Amino acid sequence: MGLSYQLLLCLLLCGGAKQCCSQPLWLLPGGTPTPGKLTSSVEVECLEAELVVTVSRDLFGTGKLIQPEDLTLGSENCRPLVSVATDVVRFKAQLHECSNRVQVTEDALVYSTVLLHQPRPVPGLSILRTNRADVPIECRYPRQGNVSSHAIRPTWVPFSTTVSSEEKLVFSLRLMEENWNTEKLSPTSHLGEVAYLQAEVQTGSHLPLLLFVDRCVPTPSPDQTASPYHVIVDFHGCLVDGLSESFSAFQVPRPRPETLQFTVDVFHFANSSRNTIYITCHLKVTPANQTPDELNKACSFNRSSKSWSPVEGDAEVCGCCSSGDCGSSSRSRYQAHGVSQWPKSASRRRRHVRDEADVTVGPLIFLGKASDQAVEGWASSAQTSLALGLGLAAVAFLTLAAIVLGVTRSCHTPSHVVSLSQ
């Protein structure tokens, strides 16, 4: 009763059990509490993958030594180690052994088991000198920390390996159907129609990336420096083809961050007998959370408002499209035609660019208007039919002439009459 009154008074004065008792109360059979002297008799060492429990044989602090064989760790009856010391008993077990249970909390992994003291009667007598006791054992490991006693030593990936990993990005440029759902199977288009182009990058295991079309130049051959040429996209993402009498533009919004779609009015090169077109575009990616700027943008020219508008970001990033001064360190191919205008390894010079590549779609066949093609086809068919008719007439005339000539010759041949004598 004295302990109960003291505990009640402490609770009223201090307002909590933690202030009243610095150690947990161990409950014996019958519910009788005893002060936490057992904690000073039991020591637990939590290692990286195991725990070590050291128990004083004077478990209850009464001077009465317990027997080592009366102690077990966990319900699996893990026995103590053999020790030459007479005053302590030691257990050593893996974290998953001796009935250890693991509990995951918000900030820790808690492994718990119990140390059991089950006294046996004194040999030859039916009496006990000590009480039964259950001592909870816990090991707590922070979830956000280093479990090992050694410091973490990071291994940096070599630069060549990093580059190889980045180069696993796969860029593509495809000619699409009008609904953007499937790739167009036929490469043929006519003047007055629209070519639907889709640039895309397969990011694989990379973090989310945002794709940009830096520039695009069509040529009559796969050589991107060939002549004649025409510029569709320039100045790091300005679709300058929309400045001419066309409705070429980027599609808003994007279908995905790693995809960019744009339309181009079909054209052909003047004074060129070739109808094939190869479109080479320089594609690049940046982190998806990076804000578009003058070097990374997708801008279209709005003919109705006579202004530039971006696919995403602030409209100010498109302000340089009119002047062509978009932070480029070299002259644009739109300003001066030359082989060196396509920079190589630009990702090494601009740190904010993760990766980039030149991709080509073609050959695309851009013909005249479909109606013109129909007229030309009808004229060509008529000419073919006329030539065929004249040829047949000539053959018939020659055949008739040969027949007449043969008949004439047969009429002028003399006949010989043979008379037989009687």
Curated annotation (Swiss-Prot):
GO MF annotations, alphabetized: acrosin binding; carbohydrate binding; receptor ligand activity; structural constituent of egg coat
Record carries keyword Transmembrane helix: yes
Glycan-bearing residues: T32, T34, N146, T155, T161, T162, N271, N302
Coiled-coil segments: none
GO biological-process terms attached to the record: binding of sperm to zona pellucida; blastocyst formation; egg coat formation; humoral immune response mediated by circulating immunoglobulin; negative regulation of binding of sperm to zona pellucida; negative regulation of DNA-templated transcription; oocyte development; positive regulation of acrosomal vesicle exocytosis
Tissue/organ expression: Expressed in oocytes.
PTM info: Proteolytically cleaved before the transmembrane segment to yield the secreted ectodomain incorporated in the zona pellucida. N-glycosylated.
Top-level taxonomic group: Eukaryota
Propeptide residues according to the Swiss-Prot or TrEMBL record: 350-422
Keywords for the protein's UniProt record, in alphabetical order: Cell membrane, Cleavage on pair of basic residues, Disulfide bond, Extracellular matrix, Fertilization, Glycoprotein, Membrane, Pyrrolidone carboxylic acid, Receptor, Secreted, Signal, Transmembrane, Transmembrane helix
Residues the record lists as Pyrrolidone carboxylic acid modifications: Q23
Compartments where located: Cell membrane
TM region(s), chain numbering: 387-407
Residues spanning the signal sequence: 1-22
Extracellular side: 23-386
Domains: entry comment: The ZP domain is involved in the polymerization of the ZP proteins to form the zona pellucida.
Assembly description: Polymers of ZP2 and ZP3 organized into long filaments cross-linked by ZP1 homodimers. Interacts with ZP1 and ZP2.
Family of this protein: Belongs to the ZP domain family. ZPC subfamily.
Function description: Component of the zona pellucida, an extracellular matrix surrounding oocytes which mediates sperm binding, induction of the acrosome reaction and prevents post-fertilization polyspermy. The zona pellucida is composed of 3 to 4 glycoproteins, ZP1, ZP2, ZP3, and ZP4. ZP3 is essential for sperm binding and zona matrix formation.
Name of the molecule in the record: Zona pellucida sperm-binding protein 3
Organism in which the protein naturally occurs: Mesocricetus auratus
Gene of this entry: ZP3
